């Protein structure tokens, strides 16, 4: 009897150290294999949510056009220096009428003197509201900005950011300066109708996503996509409509971004402000170029702002037919530029 008990005890001995280490190693390998798959699945879900959010914006823009027979414009005047954005104009069509009621459209979104503009106190209530449908869940940056008003110095007022930018020009020639009519659907005081989109709604971009700024200023080593370089005078600025103004080369664009004297992390810091820095984007280059965006002086509307995202390989975009597509970083540059124009008569057969 005792002998059988000893045999049973011998048969029930625990794991040896070697066996335990093998099991741990196997579990570690399984986790290592599964974790990237889980991360990819989560990013795919976030990218889908991003596309759905952008689709809501597109539907709102089209509903605005359907009701008013004109696409929403970007309000601006020389005295205001900053009008209301497309994103502000479509609030009633985004089921955000309660936020829209907080905006006093008889007053500008900003007040102060040129070069020293601040959020108009009358608009502070609306500007502090977060609109989830204007954000990409993959971005990961804090959308609440308390550091900035307009010129880079803040006084604690809360602004809420925006990832989805209105396409304000192809960026070719002088078509990056939205203070004047550009070749896109949106620019300052635009009144574009469907009849003016001769390229076709399925060949014309309305929105592209971009990354939020990182809330920080610096004079060197900028974070690409998160900080915008201040480059002073940009090629073609102030010459809108003049013939013969050529587009800057990619090398020049790189020099604008990498050779700036200072950088600000306020890209997309407010969905309310109708300025390229905050709510506009160009199609001059494919998504996610490897150098920083660049802007002119703080009192100007122009700059080279590109589509960017935290998604792998590209960025989401919204066409004027209401469809949302993912545009790869490797898309042909001329095709992407053509998608930014409403009446350029270009061949964009390569977007599929």
Language-model region placement:
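Internal low-complexity, small-residue/proline-rich segments
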Residues: 40-352
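N-terminal leader/signal peptides at the extreme start of proteins
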Residues: 1-17
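N-terminal single-pass transmembrane signal-anchor helix
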Residues: 12-46, 56
């Amino acid at each position: 009897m005792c002998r059988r008990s000893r045999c049973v005890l011998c048969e029930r001995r625990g794991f040896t150290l070697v066996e335990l280490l093998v099991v741990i190693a196997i579990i570690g390998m399984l986790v290592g294999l599964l974790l990237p798959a889980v991360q990819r699945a989560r990013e795919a879900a976030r990218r889908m949510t991003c596309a759905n959010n952008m689709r809501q914006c597109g539907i709102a823009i089209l509903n605005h056009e359907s009701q008013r027979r004109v696409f929403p414009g970007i309000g601006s005047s020389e005295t205001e220096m900053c009008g209301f954005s497309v994103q502000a104009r479509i609030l009633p069509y985004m089921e955000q009428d309660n936020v829209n009621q907080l905006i006093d459209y008889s007053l500008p979104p900003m007040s102060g003197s040129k070069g020293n503009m601040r959020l108009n106190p009358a608009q502070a209530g609306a500007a502090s509201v977060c609109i989830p449908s204007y954000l990409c869940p993959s971005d990961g940056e804090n959308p609440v900005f308390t550091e900035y008003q307009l010129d880079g110095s803040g006084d604690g007022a809360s602004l809420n950011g925006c990832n989805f930018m209105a396409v304000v020009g192809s960026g070719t020639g002088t078509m990056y300066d939205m203070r004047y009519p550009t070749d896109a659907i949106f620019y300052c005081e635009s009144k574009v109708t469907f009849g003016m989109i001769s390229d076709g709604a399925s060949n014309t971009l309305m929105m592209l996503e971009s990354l939020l700024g990182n809330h920080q200023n610096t004079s060197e080593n900028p974070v690409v996509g998160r900080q915008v370089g201040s480059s002073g005078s940009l090629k073609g600025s102030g010459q809108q409509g003049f013939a013969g103004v050529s587009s800057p080369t990619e090398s020049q664009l790189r020099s604008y971004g990498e050779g700036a004297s200072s950088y600000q992390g306020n890209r997309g810091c407010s969905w309310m402000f109708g300025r390229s820095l905050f709510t506009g984007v160009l199609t001059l280059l494919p998504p996610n170029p490897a150098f920083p965006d660049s802007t002119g002086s703080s009192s100007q509307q122009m700059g080279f702002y590109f589509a960017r995202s935290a998604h792998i390989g590209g960025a989401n975009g919204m066409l004027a037919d209401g469809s949302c597509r993912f545009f790869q970083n490797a898309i042909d540059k001329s095709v992407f530029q053509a998608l930014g124009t409403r009446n350029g008569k270009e061949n964009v057969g390569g977007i599929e």
